Amino acid sequence: MKRLIPFVISMLAVPLIGGDLHGKVAAHGVRNSADAVVYVDRIAGKTFAAPSEHAKIDQKNMQFVPRVVPVVVGTTVDFLNSDALLHNVFSPDACADRFNLGTWPQGQTKTFTFKKECFASLLCKVHPEMDGFVAVLPTPYFAVTSADGSYHIKDVPDGTYTVKVWHPKLKATQKSVTVAGATEANFEIAK
């Protein structure tokens, strides 16, 4: 019995790991199913602190890389310029405080902290063909789809949630999903 008590106490100290939410998003009206953000909208009674580690978006070959980045509200994003020319990052969106980081050369990084839930567009005043997006979300349970539409969100607590899908060019969708262990949820989105 004396050996059992420490074991039981140690098991209580181990955090419970949730299930995995996975599936595919079929995106109609675009070249492929990449760049959709699949996320658990809210978990009743829980709020999530932003991670101390910054998210990173590079400006490389005159593109934002990655093009779509989901983060939790309060996350700071580092914007690196890897190109041998000047770049600028700004967002015209009010939810992102219409920030403008100015212009900077290769090898330098500027940062911005996203304080409100939103889908913020990223643009470059020097190169108007560049665009990117930051999805600022209420939970850390999110994924960006690959070109075939597949996604995988790890460690989602068991429960029933509204799972939403957002894409830069398509109409958002949502549905109720009950996560219990490994759970599959598929979506379709279109213009």
Describe the residue ranges of each PLM region.
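Bacterial N-terminal signal peptides
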Residues: 6-15
